[in-house]
A protein has these predicted regions:
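Class I S-adenosyl-L-methionine-dependent methyltransferase catalytic core
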Residues: 1-195
Length: 195
């Protein structure tokens, strides 16, 4: 997260070492404790005993986001985005995405226009681009922090930091391959197209 904010401030693309750092990000899926108050040391008394070891890193996370937000409203947008992702931000391992991309390529499926509707850190995009490097990619990632990092990893691709439900009608039928491991669960998403 720190690296992504640094790249934004400096207005540049990441070095290979910075790309390696960005790729290690794995989201906050299952870590509800990041939503607990962590501004002051006294906030720790309200934390569950099992989460206390994460108090200091959580305080650092919020400090980092606050320092890199233009204002309190932007900080709140980041926190709200984190709230929206703690139940769904579980990213597919590279071994699985590589295997799926290899099987598709083995069957002659080489996309010209690739859609990733829930990209996370872009594992499916990375795996498929090894077989179809010229593919035109559109990747959606709803979480603001993850989307920021994904944009740095794929500066030459179309990365949209918003929900897939925002895709415009002209893209219906546009893609020849959609590849994803969308979040599963009973969380409803509003989509006016299917109202």
């Amino acid at each position: 997260i720190r690296t992504a904010f640094l790249l934004d401030r400096e207005g540049r693309t990441p070095t290979e070492a910075e790309r390696d750092i960005l790729r290690r990000y794995c989201g906050f899926g299952g870590l509800k404790c990041i939503l607990n108050p962590a501004k002051e040391l006294t906030d720790a008394v309200r934390w569950a005993k099992s989460d206390l070891e994460l108090f200091a890193p959580t305080a650092e996370l919020h400090r980092l986001i606050r320092e890199n937000s233009r204002n309190e409203m932007e900080y709140k947008r980041y926190v709200d985005s984190l709230k929206g992702s703690v139940l769904t931000a579980f990213y597919t391992p590279k071994e699985i995405t590589d295997t799926l991309a290899g099987v598709l390529a083995g069957h002659g499926i080489m996309p010209v226009r690739l859609l990733e509707p829930s990209a996370g850190m872009g594992a499916f995009v990375d795996s498929m681009l090894r077989y179809a490097p010229q593919a035109d990619v559109m990747a959606f990632e709803k979480d603001l922090l993850t989307g920021r990092m994904l944009r740095h990893l794929h500066p030459d691709r179309k990365v949209r930091v918003e929900g897939f439900e925002k895709i415009e009608k002209p893209f219906n039928g546009h893609f020849d391959l959609a590849l994803s491991n969308i979040p599963f669960g009973d969380i409803a998403v509003f989509d006016a197209e299917y109202e």
